[in-house]
Regions:
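Short aromatic/hydrophobic "clamp" motif used to bind/position activated sugar donors
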Residues: 32
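Short, flexible, basic/aromatic active-site loop/helix in glycosyltransferases
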Residues: 82-107
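Acidic donor-binding segment of Leloir-type glycosyltransferases
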Residues: 1-9
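Non-catalytic, C-terminal membrane-associated alpha-helical segments of glycosyltransferases
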Residues: 174-184, 189, 194-241
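Glycine-rich, basic loop-to-helix element that forms the pyrophosphate-binding segment
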Residues: 10-27
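Acidic donor-binding loop at a coil-to-helix junction in glycosyltransferase catalytic cores
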Residues: 110, 134-141
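Conserved donor NDP-sugar-binding/catalytic core segment of glycosyltransferases
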Residues: 44-78
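Active-site donor/metal-binding and catalytic loop motifs
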Residues: 129-130, 154-173, 183-187
Length: 241
């Protein structure tokens, strides 16, 4: 089949979330795919994504399988799982020891930069381009998506790709800590009635406190901890639109 590319330039878009929302008006397909610019798709990636949607109408949103995903040690994995519950539960990083390449696997959170969606889900689940989520945009959108489609998110194992994340430098790491902490509060404020009495917020903040202390000692720089405290202050004071 013929493939055509349309390049759209709009200079006043405020980040990836705004760009995604803006791009929807140009779509004419039943399946919409968003891709980061640091990935390489295997030759059959899009074909297998489309087949999965065709064969299982329960699939409303999907990710492919990242082949070069870095492995976490047991301590980091355990700490992550213990501190990411309730609103912040995220099973994208779970290890799949035995995998059936032809069987989609249900997950609770999708990565936005390697995601595919049925067009109709955007009729009632829109991207939030008012609150400027960035590092936790995936989690924020997945929470609202799950409210409409409880069992609609899947990993498609035979849709394979490589994802080359750029290693963060010190300044980016500090910004990540600050923004993650702030956006944890933002997610809580948007969805507090679905929270586990605030325990989920408390635990994920503990995770980032440990994270910031670790990098402060590792790099002998207290500014990582300061980033956590600034994120706390901004998160407490921020108002959700």
């Amino acid at each position: 089949k013929n493939i055509s590319n349309k390049y759209i330039e709009k200079n006043n878009l405020r980040g990836l979330v705004d760009a995604k929302k803006y791009s929807l008006q140009y779509n004419s397909s039943d399946i919409i795919t968003f891709l980061d610019d640091d990935i390489i798709l295997m030759p059959t990636y899009l074909q297998n994504i489309c087949l999965a949607f065709q064969n299982n109408f329960q699939i409303k949103g999907a990710n492919g399988l990242i082949l070069n995903k870095s492995k976490q040690n047991i301590f980091k994995k355990t700490l992550f799982n213990l501190t990411h519950i309730g609103l912040y539960k995220d099973d994208r990083g779970k290890t799949i020891k035995t995998i059936d390449k032809d069987k989609p696997i249900q997950v609770n959170t999708l990565s936005g930069g390697i995601s595919s969606w049925r067009r109709e889900i955007f009729n009632n689940t829109q991207f939030d381009n008012k609150n400027f989520f960035h590092f936790m945009e995936d989690v924020e959108f997945s929470i609202r998506f799950k409210k409409k489609y409880k069992a609609g998110a899947y990993l498609i194992p035979n849709a394979e790709l490589l994802h080359y994340h750029i290693e963060s430098n010190a300044e980016n790491k500090k910004k990540q800590i600050l923004m993650h902490v702030k956006e944890c509060f933002m997610i809580f404020k948007k969805n507090r009635r679905f929270s586990i009495l605030g325990l989920d917020l408390t635990l994920i903040l503990l995770y980032y406190l440990i994270y910031s202390i670790y990098f402060s000692f590792k790099n002998k720089n207290i500014k990582y901890l300061f980033s956590f405290l600034i994120g706390m202050t901004r998160g407490i004071n921020i108002k959700i639109k």
